[in-house]
Amino acid sequence: IGKGTVIGNNVTIYKGSIIGENVRIDDNAIIGKQPMRAANSIFKDKSEKPPCRIGNECIIGTSAVIYAGCIIGEKCLIADLATVREDVTIGDMTIIGRGAAIENHCKIGSRCKIETDAYITAYSELEDEVFIAPCVATSNDNSAGKDPDRFKKMKGVTVKKGGRIGVNATILPGKTIH
């Protein structure tokens, strides 16, 4: 835990988590949580993920959950109630809004804004300076769970540098937004 970091009440920081300098972690946040798997999960890897890393001068909001295996750049805001799943990389100066969910295996660029209650599905990539408005939903499975081979076909969403997605939009699997 870096110099100048302030940790709120009832915060859980799991073993090995790396937290930079001058980070603020608000009440009830959970840092470095290992993922859990349902019996029918498509993700079969049960090995322990490496510790999460949070860069300098980040702010982690109340009740935010950041999983192990995440790398969060410097000067990011992960707002209240946001979730950042395992194997996610977030660039510098990015905002993950209140209640937003970033699923596993995503790459989020620098200086992005992902607003309140947005859902970024697994295997998505958002390049630098992307704006995602509130309540945007993305998807990665065209078969809606019906195709037994769907796991081979899953593809998240790609948003190119500077891309913008408006409020309450639904983006289908494999789409690229310029």
Tell where the protein language model's regions lie, with residue ranges.
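Structural signal for interior beta-strand "rungs" in well-ordered beta-sheet cores
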Residues: I1-A38, I42-H178
